[in-house]
Amino acid sequence: MSAEIVHLEPGNLQHEYGLDTQRLQPWAVLNAPFESSWALARPRTRSVLHSHHEHEIFIAIRGSAVIECDGKRASFRAGDIAFLRPGLEHRLLNDGDEEFMFYSVWWDEEMAEKFIARNREEVPA
C-alpha cells in the first residue's frame, strides 16, 4: 500500500476571499471531519474581512504576514499556527514584497457528524 498524495498545483489556483487557493476536498479517498485548502497571499494583498461559524486553523508555511482579528493585528510567519474561533472577524494582510503561503483547516459540528456517519458505513461490523 502506498500513500495517497494530492499535489499543490500553483498554476491551477482559484481566487477566494482575496487569496489564491487550492482546496483539498473533494478527495475520494479521504474521509475527514474537516475541510482544508492551500492559500497564497500575493505581495501587497489582503484577504476579505469575514467571519463564519466554523472553527479554523491557519498553518504558516512560507513567508510572513499579519492576521487581523476583531481589529487587532498580530505577526504571523512560517512555522506559526493560528486558531480562529467561530464568529471571529478576521483577515490576512501581506504588506510585504514576498508571497505568503499557509494551509487552512476548518470544521464544524455538521462536518464531524457526517464524518462519523461515513466512517460507520466504511468500517465492517
Q: Which residues are covered by each model-predicted region?
A:
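A short hydrophobic beta-strand segment most commonly corresponding to one strand
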Residues: 39, 83, 98-114
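Phosphate-centric recognition/catalysis
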Residues: 45
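Short acidic-glycine-tyrosine-enriched beta hairpin
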Residues: 71-86
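Structural motif
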Residues: 64-66, 73, 89, 99
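Short beta-strand His + acidic residue motifs that chelate non-heme Fe in jelly-roll/DSBH
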Residues: 48-49, 67-68, 84, 90-96
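Short, conserved beta-strand element in jelly-roll/cupin
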Residues: 40-41, 51-67
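A short, N-terminal "cap"/entry segment at the start of jelly-roll beta-barrel domains
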Residues: 1-34, 48, 117-125
